Regions:
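Signature of extracytoplasmic/envelope-associated structural regions
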Residues: 1-306
Length: 306
């Protein structure tokens, strides 16, 4: 007998984590990987393969709805004001649920945000790139224990569809000290990249990650800036060994949209171009530094206009 159409499993779903339901723009992917190692023999070659670890990854690009609750999950305070050396998973397990419209609920019992989405600031782009969550063993569990990593259960889908309100799409302007960037070629991209170090035990494999640092950058191709303005913004004339932690914050904002702040920013790249169809200003790159007064590295804020 051939395969029946009704036996093929497919269709969309949504992700719930930290009390927030995420609707995706282009699909949800869950990868559950078992790391392995070969057992070699000089006489016979590979004798066996053994399992060494287990890690899950759930990735999606959020649809773009803006809300304070969503921002609190995607850009948590422990990244805004980096708690270097902290446990990423913490002492209490935070479940992540992928619920399909077809009526199946996959629950990863211990999950954490491990890749922030890029923030895309443009009137013709939704606000977020791809986010990634990592799933590990539940706290104190061995891989062989019951309910140690995930559960699967039938459950009627009841999470609805993404709301039409709060969708992004705003014109953003940047301010950096006396430098004003009122318009760009194709908007701004802000990247927040946590540096995470895995923590493993001999009996369980990876059970946590430690926050080792956070890198925050922003880039845009500005319009209307002169050669002298771009060169003056670069630290070219700073002394060798001089600190590049600037006195000014980079603030990118739009009425009705987000306000993104890179603390104590500096311009690190700013090429100039000459050519028949080339724009003079190339892509400006900024990087953030921790503000020693309040410990903050960046901020992402949204005020609901309603």
């Amino acid at each position: 007998m051939g395969t029946t159409r009704q036996s093929i499993i497919r269709g969309p779903g949504s992700v719930t984590f930290g009390g927030v339901t995420f609707y995706d723009a282009s699909g949800i992917t869950a990868e559950v990987d078992s790391s392995t190692s070969d057992v070699p023999s000089s006489m016979s070659g590979k004798l066996d393969t053994i399992k060494t670890d287990q890690v899950g990854k759930v990735s999606l690009t959020p649809v773009g709805n803006l809300s304070e609750a969503l921002l609190a999950v995607l850009f948590p305070d422990w990244l805004k004001t980096p708690e270097i050396g902290r446990s990423v998973f913490g002492s209490a397990d935070a479940p992540l649920v992928v619920h399909s419209r077809a009526g199946q609920k996959l629950t990863f019992l211990a999950a954490a945000l491990t890749k922030c989405p890029d923030i895309l600031l443009s009137p013709v782009k939704t606000a977020f790139g791809q986010a990634e969550f990592t799933a590990l063993l539940a706290n104190g569990k061995l891989p062989t224990d019951a309910n140690s990593f995930y559960t699967v259960a039938a459950a009627t889908y009841d999470l609805g569809e993404p709301p039409r309100s709060g969708l992004s799409g705003f014109h953003y302007a940047g301010t950096f000290g006396s430098l004003s960037i009122p318009d760009t070629v194709d908007g701004w991209t802000v990247s927040i990249a946590p540096r995470l170090d895995p923590v493993a035990t001999d009996s369980q494999g990876t059970i946590d990650y430690t926050l080792g640092g956070v890198d925050v950058t922003a880039k845009c191709t500005p319009l209307g800036l002169s050669e002298s303005q771009i060169l003056a913004a670069l630290p070219v004339l700073s002394g060798r060994g001089a600190s590049l932690a600037g006195a000014n914050d980079l603030v990118i904002a739009a009425t009705g949209g987000l306000t993104v702040t890179l603390k104590k920013a500096t311009v690190v790249t700013g090429p100039l171009n000459w050519g028949t169809t080339m724009l003079r200003a190339g892509e400006l790159g900024f990087t953030a530094h921790i503000d020693v007064e309040d410990g903050k590295l960046f901020d992402v804020e949204y005020t609901d206009p309603a």
